[in-house]
């Protein structure tokens, strides 16, 4: 079954909202269940974004070379974030529940940390590259503005993380808030036609 643009936009919106709800749940409760939910939604969200971006690329007839580059960068995001979060859920927290002391530099959410670096590469570098390839390959002016803005935010957050952990938080404005706004915009435009 081919996913159309409206369904992709709705999926993107639902995925982002579910992600933000899971994040808020963890920030409020600080429970292992909420953290597992948040990490699971991060992986699921990456897959939803991959599908949504590929549908957008098809609908707006992005050039084949740029579509391939986009697919590679999206796959990088999905693969790396899956490695980071599945390692956190399946290894790190299991070791901790067994009483093993795991150094912070192996934990997601700690800085500096191996898992956070993997996630920063996934969401900062590869997702930034994805937005930039969309910008380069699409003719629609509004989507170009959204995509270049989101791409720059992701890449600035990625580069900023080398200097300070707090500079990383520029990136979620691109892949989180920006992607949500872009999906809402696409949905509203699709409904107006």
Mark where each language-model region is.
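Hydrophobic, aromatic-enriched alpha-helical segments typical of multi-pass transmembrane helices
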Residues: 1-193
């Amino acid at each position: 079954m081919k996913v159309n643009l409206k369904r992709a936009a709705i999926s993107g919106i639902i995925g982002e909202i579910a992600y933000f709800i899971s994040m808020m749940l963890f920030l409020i409760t600080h429970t292992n269940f909420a953290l597992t939910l948040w990490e699971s939604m991060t992986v699921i969200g990456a897959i939803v974004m991959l599908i949504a971006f590929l549908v957008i690329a098809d609908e707006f007839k992005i050039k084949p070379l740029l579509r391939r580059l986009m697919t590679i960068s999206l796959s990088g995001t999905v693969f790396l974030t899956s490695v980071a979060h599945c390692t956190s859920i399946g290894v790190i927290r299991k070791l901790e529940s067994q009483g093993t002391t795991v150094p912070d530099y192996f934990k997601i959410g700690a800085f500096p940390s191996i898992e956070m670096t993997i996630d920063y590469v996934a969401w900062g570098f590869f997702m930034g590259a994805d937005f930039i390839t969309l910008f380069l390959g699409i003719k629609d002016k509004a989507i170009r503005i959204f995509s270049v803005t989101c791409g720059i935010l992701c890449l600035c957050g990625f580069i900023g993380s080398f200097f300070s952990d707090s500079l990383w938080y520029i990136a979620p404005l691109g892949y989180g808030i920006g992607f949500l706004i872009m999906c809402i915009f696409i949905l509203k435009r699709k409904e107006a036609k």
